[in-house]
Amino acid sequence: LVAFLLGLLSAVLPAFAVAKKELWEKPSQLLLPKPPRAGAKIVLERITPLWKRLSFTEKVTMRNIFRYKQRMFMTLFGVAGSIALLFAGLGIRSSVSNLNQQQFEDIIHYDMIVAKQPNTSSALDEELTKLLDSKDVKEYLNVHFETLQKIAGSNKDTQEISTLVFNDRDDKLVDSYVSLHDRDRNKTLKLSNDGAIISEKMAKLLNLKVGDTITVQNSQDESVKIKIAGITEMYMGHFLFMNASYYQKAFGTPSVNNANLITLAEPTKQNVENMAAKFINLPNVYGVVQNNNLKLQISTMVNSLTQVIGILITVSILLAVVVLHNLTNINVSERIHELSTVKVLGFYNNEVSLYIYRETIYLSIIGIFVGFGLGQALHQYMVSIIPPDRIMFDPSIGLATYLLPAVLIGFILIILGFVVNNRLAKLNMLEALSSVE
């Protein structure tokens, strides 16, 4: 209903306003082209050093652009709007297309987390160790794994934070299992005794920065204050990373190795599932978190978004075509008498076409740059509201996101340029000049 009312309003109100304005004029005035205001100067004419350097045709173009202000703003906003939509659509597609690779190849290097039951016998522990030392496992690392809770997000939901605590002696091995990287400062992060490293999405939900303190709840519903020593790039889930020394400082108790980060020799989807089944069947294994399930969640979301983004891109392209085509046709139709006069004065066909089409080209170029600014703002807004609380989109924008919209508008302008040129080449000058009388 809201969409229908907005569509009706945007279609009917402009038509009503324009018709009402025109009908106030006398019929005799409506039959004649509207003359420019006598002695009027445009803004550029007042900038003397710049105005003197313009050629005659450029001065004519600038005067015509500012003479038809309504059409100028329509072209600017039309091109800028289509560029902004196309930029945002391509930007979102770029932001989500490589999420799995960024999360599970560039950042997370382990294939699964195996959590152990507490207080198990040494015989059961040996069975687990035997499987860990098998040829199917490339490497593994003993860590403390704990799930903390924090209320965050727009709906004030309870967020689960996966906490990984590494032994102090294993500091140099952390990079083999997870790459801790500050995306904004392009800096590699290291664990310290003075705080924990939090995932970027959680930091954004809580508006945290380095040096702040976060209060979380542990499994016993006890409040624990944790100082933020760094913010790491992370696209799936909420994480806290710390070493054993800081864990004991924050929690008041030493950490206990109760889990293993495991990297498999063959990390194929089927092999990960088979190994996860082997681990979960061991009596002293509490649970297994495998990356396959997380990859599937991201893939499902990306596929759904890709279809919606495809529609957005298609609509933005159609908008650009419709806006430029209609405005060009209106421009030619309303100024047919002026163009016939120019042609009678001895201008060649290409010169006549550029006489009027140069305005569209200049305005489209300005509209492209305005659209880039609007598109960046729209992209950042969409990146912040579309993903759920546990997922972050890559906010960076690739070069292709800038090039494709500009190339597309350029292609549309070239096609329409040929259309305008052919139309003006067939123009009957005498008929157009006599039509006013």
Per-region residue spans from a language model:
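Small-residue transmembrane helix packing/gating motifs
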Residues: 107-108, 190, 232-273, 292
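Short helix-loop junctions at transmembrane helix boundaries
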Residues: 1, 20-21, 368-411, 417-431
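Short cytosolic juxtamembrane segments of multi-pass membrane proteins
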Residues: 24-42, 425-437
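Interfacial "coupling" helices/loops that link adjacent transmembrane helices in transporter permeases
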Residues: 1, 310, 322-362
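Hydrophobic secondary-structure segments that place a key small or acidic residue at a functional site
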Residues: 186-246
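A short beta-strand structural signal in non-transmembrane regions
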Residues: 111-117, 202-203, 229-231, 254-282, ...
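Juxtamembrane segments of multi-pass membrane proteins
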Residues: 56-192, 200-201, 212
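Peri-transmembrane interface segments
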Residues: 92, 96-105, 271-318, 331-333, ...
